[in-house]
Amino acid sequence: IGVFCLLCPVIAANGPAIIGSLAMVLLAAYICYVVHAVVVYSLTVGTLGGVSPLKFFKGMLPAIMFAFSSASSVGTLPINLECTEKLGAKREIASFVLPLGATINMDGTAIYQGVCAIFIASCYGIHLTLSQMLTIVLTATLASIGTAGVPGAGMVMLAMVLTSVGLPVDGIALVAGVDRIFDMGRTTVNI
């Protein structure tokens, strides 16, 4: 009901066609989340960790499912710690690295901010220059490092990304109604 209420003013102002656009931007974000997780994490755990990517994802499945349903990186820490220990990580190392990663390893948030900034620019008919796109990449990366690991924090930092390239902050209203759906995917990548 809450998401429906948030979407009503957006649909009233932009027409029902915005629903298809929101579905497409959600699809784009989730494709980016999956590609990032599969490519980056598989290469990292395979190359640096010496663990089979399949074994890694299977071992992390409880944490992945909890992160997806809770949308909280910090809330997932106990399960994440348990999963990493079962995969062979030493408790001393995992208990240091995981809380640090829950704060500064927000790749999903950076992806979300980049996708949403481009979507908002498109909705407003603003054509971004290469310089503006690079600024989005830089500010999204910096914002993701400083984002709290709690539900909805990425949307707050999106305002900074939009401001950095002169996009209207009002555009956040376009994605606010479906932010929870974005948040589930980005948190899964963040853990």
Model-derived features: where do they sit?
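Alpha-helical transmembrane segments of multipass membrane proteins
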Residues: 32, 36, 40, 105-108, ...
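Entry/N-cap segments of selected transmembrane alpha helices
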Residues: 16-41
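Membrane-interfacial loop-to-helix junctions in multi-pass transporters
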Residues: 31-33, 46-56, 87-94, 125-135, ...
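Transmembrane alpha-helix boundary and packing residues in multipass membrane permease domains
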Residues: 2-9, 41-45, 82, 114-118, ...
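Helix-loop-helix junctions within the multi-pass membrane cores of secondary transporters/permeases
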Residues: 62-144
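Hydrophobic, small-residue-rich transmembrane alpha-helices and their short perimembrane loops
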Residues: 56-76, 103, 170-186
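Transmembrane helix-loop junctions in multi-pass membrane proteins
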Residues: 6-21, 123-127
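Transmembrane alpha-helical segments and their short flanking loops
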Residues: 114-191
